[in-house]
Amino acid sequence: MKRRVLSGVLASSVLAASSLVAMSTVSGASVQLTKVNFVYDFPGPDMEITPIVAAQQQGYFASQGLKVNIIFPPDTSTSSQMLTTGAANIGFITTSDMAVAVQAKAPLLSVANYSMSNNWGLFAKPGSKLTLANLKGKKLFSWGDTWTNAMLPFVVKKAGLKMSDITVVTASNDMPLLLAGKIDWTTSTSNYGVPGIFGATGKNPVAITGAAAGVPNVPVWVYATTKSYASAHASVVKAFLKAVLEGTKYASAHQSAAAAAFTKAYPKSGYTAAYNKLGWSLTVPLLTNAKGKYFVQTDAQWSLLDQGLVATKQIKTAPTPSTYYSNAYLPAQ
C-alpha cells in the first residue's frame, strides 16, 4: 500500500527518529519522562506519521510526560509482532492487521482510529480505459501487506471474478512497473496513490476506490497496543493519545507547515516535499468522523470488516466487536 524505500534510506530514517526524540526532551530535561516505544506500520517514514512528528516538535509528548521513541519495523508484517513481544508499546497498524492478529489469539487492543473511512482501491495511469468490467486477465500490483491481501478479494468479487482470474505482482516499487506497462493497476489508498502517480506523470491517475471497488467502508489504520500494556499503563496510553490528538489537530490546521516539518525531519525518506504536502492534504479529511471527532471507534466498523473477511474466507469466525477495541483511553474532544 505504501511505497517502499531503500535500506540506506531506512538507516537515515532511524537516525532522524532519534533526533526527534532528542528534540522532544530538551525542554523537559529536568523532568522524568516516561519512555514509550512507538512502532510504525512501515519500514520507513512517510507523511502519515506527520501527527507524531508534530507532537514531538510542538512539545505535546513532553508536556504529557512522555519520551516517545519511533521505531520502523523491518517489514510490513512485523509491527503487530513487536507489540505482542513487548519490543514496542504502542503501534500504528491496519484494521486488517488487528483482525488477523485477533484471529491468531494475539492480545492486541485498538485504542483509537487513525482514519475513519476506506479510501483504498486501484490506480491506473492517467488516461487509462481500464475498469472493473475488463479486470479479468489484468496484472495488479500488491505490496504483500495484510491490508492489500485482505482487500483484493473484495475487488475481484465486485468484478464477478475469482482471484485466479487476475495476476498479482509483488515487488519493492510499483511506479516503474506501472509506467512501463508491466502492471495494469497498482493498489493503494488515495492519499498515497494520487500523489505518487501525479508526481511521476503530472496528471491524476484513473482510480477506483471505496465502494466503487467493492471494499467495506471501514477505517484503514488504528493506534494499537496490547491488552496487558493498556491495563498496566492506562495513564501512559491516555497521555500518548492526548498528545497525538494535539499533534493531529495542529497538523490539520497547519497542513503546509506540518508537511514541511515532516520533510525536514526525514529528508532521506524517499519522498519529495510536493508529495508529502499533497499526500498530507489528502489525509486530513480522512481523520474525522461525521461529527468532526477524531479517534472514536464503533462496533459497526469492526462488525463490517469481519463480515467481509468471513465472506471472502480470510478469517473463519467473527469475534464480538469489543474483542478488538476500547474507547476508554480517548482524550476529551
Language-model features and meaning:
Residues 96, 174-268:
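Pocket-lining segment of extracytoplasmic ligand-binding domains
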